[in-house]
From Swiss-Prot:
<feature type="topological domain" description="Mitochondrial matrix">
    <location>
        <begin position="1"/>
        <end position="11"/>
    </location>
</feature>
<feature type="transmembrane region" description="Helical; Name=XII">
    <location>
        <begin position="447"/>
        <end position="478"/>
    </location>
</feature>
<keyword id="KW-0813">Transport</keyword>
<dbReference type="GO" id="GO:0046872">
    <property type="term" value="F:metal ion binding"/>
</dbReference>
<dbReference type="InterPro" id="IPR000883">
    <property type="entry name" value="Cyt_C_Oxase_1"/>
</dbReference>
<feature type="topological domain" description="Mitochondrial intermembrane">
    <location>
        <begin position="358"/>
        <end position="370"/>
    </location>
</feature>
<feature type="topological domain" description="Mitochondrial matrix">
    <location>
        <begin position="328"/>
        <end position="335"/>
    </location>
</feature>
<feature type="binding site">
    <location>
        <position position="368"/>
    </location>
    <ligand>
        <name>Mg(2+)</name>
    </ligand>
</feature>
<keyword id="KW-0349">Heme</keyword>
<feature type="transmembrane region" description="Helical; Name=VII">
    <location>
        <begin position="270"/>
        <end position="286"/>
    </location>
</feature>
<dbReference type="GO" id="GO:0020037">
    <property type="term" value="F:heme binding"/>
</dbReference>
<feature type="binding site" description="axial binding residue">
    <location>
        <position position="376"/>
    </location>
    <ligand>
        <name>heme a3</name>
    </ligand>
</feature>
<feature type="transmembrane region" description="Helical; Name=VIII">
    <location>
        <begin position="299"/>
        <end position="327"/>
    </location>
</feature>
<feature type="transmembrane region" description="Helical; Name=VI">
    <location>
        <begin position="228"/>
        <end position="261"/>
    </location>
</feature>
<comment type="function">
    <text>Component of the cytochrome c oxidase, the last enzyme in the mitochondrial electron transport chain which drives oxidative phosphorylation. The respiratory chain contains 3 multisubunit complexes succinate dehydrogenase (complex II, CII), ubiquinol-cytochrome c oxidoreductase (cytochrome b-c1 complex, complex III, CIII) and cytochrome c oxidase (complex IV, CIV), that cooperate to transfer electrons derived from NADH and succinate to molecular oxygen, creating an electrochemical gradient over the inner membrane that drives transmembrane transport and the ATP synthase.</text>
</comment>
<feature type="topological domain" description="Mitochondrial matrix">
    <location>
        <begin position="262"/>
        <end position="269"/>
    </location>
</feature>
<keyword id="KW-0186">Copper</keyword>
Length: 513
């Protein structure tokens, strides 16, 4: 019974739970790796050997956090759990394909871990640029294992994307129009389209790299008429939409949380929010070369990518100000989930501002591959995506489990995490402006102070992670039942109680407008 329920599951709630558990476990591995990085950089001098092992840790940290933590939790966990409930569907459109999407991830994770264990490991950074990733600079199986791992994770995401698109377009009840769909459902739809369009390009790029390494092709080798810059174009055509894939479901969750805890019936500017997400999704595909300002593009090309990148700030600003307008005049409830949402809005905006600075091709020449870039994307990921995940988790935990967290501890947890991540990443702006480059295991002692501060912050974040594990244990141990939840048009997922029955919406639902 246990085997049939959890191994062969076709139930969206069970698969969502599997995704959440897998993402939490992978997140702890990724956090451990990030602490190794910060321990190495906590003071000048060497801690862990040479730069190769350091870069293997950096590479594994990036891949694990992106492909095995943020995406499984946001799209697999929250997406599977909430999308069918929010649109009144009995399950996902392809329940068995849903199961396969999940079970492709553990083998993929295993291959990634194997890549860091065999030979010298893949010390390429998550971008896996040739010629460093070629068979001379990285002889052995490591990079090949990484490529296979990415293939499996990519197939998993593509299948999941097909499933979500079909479910959202096809499985709404007849009375529900696309414009009565909750914003989280919209965000998952846009995310799924981005995945479906960008992942095949990554698959092509890394397959060409695989044949360059093993079958003597020369796609990326100038000696045979190839060009390593081609790989960068292919990778970033995937890589830039990918960062929007990581944040868009978070936008959807934040919209729900802000609306709910402001005591509002609906978010401010619903259609504006929908159009903003679709604009971000479209623009995300036409700005990729802003990651490549230093490879020597024409000045007019650089001008275009600078301008196009800055345009993305407009729909993003629409979303930020709509969240603030949703808060305005509301009866605000300072719950832990609301704290995460407010922290998200502030810190994501800070990360967006540093991104505006980096969008300038001339400034980026100076700041490229320094800690300024690291600070920028960790503000939008470590304090954007992660804060959205945490807010969504404490908000929907009663729905998933039927029990409530201790709200005092949840607030303390937020404060510790807030202090920790800011102490970790704010000083990295200073390091970057002072010219400290990324992906080095050591540094001149002029950079000691801010690196030490940054490493202290990372250990504060670690205590926050440990407190969260304890909070979850405490909730299941204490078994506090859930009070009745007020139903509004934006939180129909609570309709069936906490937790909902194994099968929901077995008959078509009707939407009263």
């Amino acid at each position: 019974m246990f085997i049939t329920r959890w191994l062969f599951s076709t139930n969206h709630k069970d698969i969502g739970t599997l995704y959440l558990l897998f993402g939490a476990w992978a997140g702890m591995v990724g956090t451990a790796l990030s602490l190794l990085i910060r321990a190495e950089l906590g003071q000048p001098g060497t801690l862990l050997g040479d730069d190769q092992i350091y870069n293997v840790i950096v590479t594994a940290h990036a891949f694990i956090m992106i492909f095995f933590m943020v995406m499984p939790i946001m799209i697999g966990g929250f997406g599977n759990w909430l999308v069918p409930l929010m649109i009144g569907a009995p399950d996902m459109a392809f329940p068995r394909m849903n199961n396969m999407s999940f079970w492709l991830l553990p083998p993929s994770f295993l291959l990634l871990l194997a890549s860091s264990m065999v030979e010298a490991g893949a010390g390429t950074g998550w971008t896996v640029y040739p010629p460093l990733a070629g068979n001379l600079a990285h002889a052995g199986a490591s990079v090949d294992l990484t490529i296979f791992s990415l293939h499996l994770a990519g197939i998993s995401s593509i299948l999941g994307a097909i499933n979500f698109i079909t479910t959202i377009i096809n499985m709404k009840p007849p009375a529900m129009t696309q414009y009565q769909t909750p914003l989280f459902v919209w965000s998952v739809l846009v995310t799924a389209v981005l995945l479906l369009l960008s992942l095949p390009v990554l698959a092509a790029g890394i397959t060409m790299l695989l044949t360059d390494r093993n079958l003597n092709t020369t796609f990326f080798d100038p000696a045979g008429g190839g060009d390593p810059i081609l790989y960068q174009h292919l990778f970033w055509f995937f890589g830039h939409p990918e960062v929007y894939i990581l944040i868009l479901p978070g936008f959807g969750m934040i919209s729900h949380i802000v609306t709910y805890y402001s005591g509002k019936k609906e978010p401010f500017g619903y259609m504006g929010m929908v159009w903003a997400m679709m604009s971000i999704g479209f623009l995300g595909f036409i700005v990729w070369a802003h990651h490549m300002f230093t490879v020597g593009m024409d000045v007019d090309t650089r001008a275009y990518f600078t301008s196009a990148t800055m345009i993305i700030a407009i729909p993003t600003g629409v979303k930020v100000f709509s969240w603030l307008a949703t808060l305005h005049g509301g009866n605000i409830k300072w719950s832990p989930a609301m704290l995460w949402a407010l922290g998200f809005i502030f810190l994501f905006t800070v990360g967006g501002l540093t991104g505006m600075l980096l969008a300038n091709s001339s400034l980026d020449i100076v700041l490229h591959d320094t800690y300024y870039v690291v600070a920028h994307f960790h503000y939008v990921l470590s304090m954007g995506a992660v804060f959205a995940i945490m807010g969504g988790f404490v908000h929907w935990f009663p729905l998933f489990s039927g029990y409530t967290l201790n709200l005092t501890w949840a607030k303390i947890h937020f404060i510790i995490m807030f202090v920790g991540v800011n102490l970790t990443f704010f000083p990295q702006h200073f390091l970057g402006l002072s010219g400290m480059p990324r992906r080095y295991s050591d540094y001149p002692d002029a950079y000691t102070m801010w690196n030490t501060v940054s490493s202290m912050g990372s250990f504060i974040s670690l205590t926050a992670v440990m407190l969260m594990i304890f909070m979850i244990w405490e909730a299941f141990a204490s078994k506090r039942e859930v009070d009745v939840v007020e139903l509004t048009p934006t939180n129909l997922e609570w309709l069936h109680g906490c937790p909902p029955p194994y099968h929901t919406f077995e008959e078509p639902a009707f939407v009263k407008v």
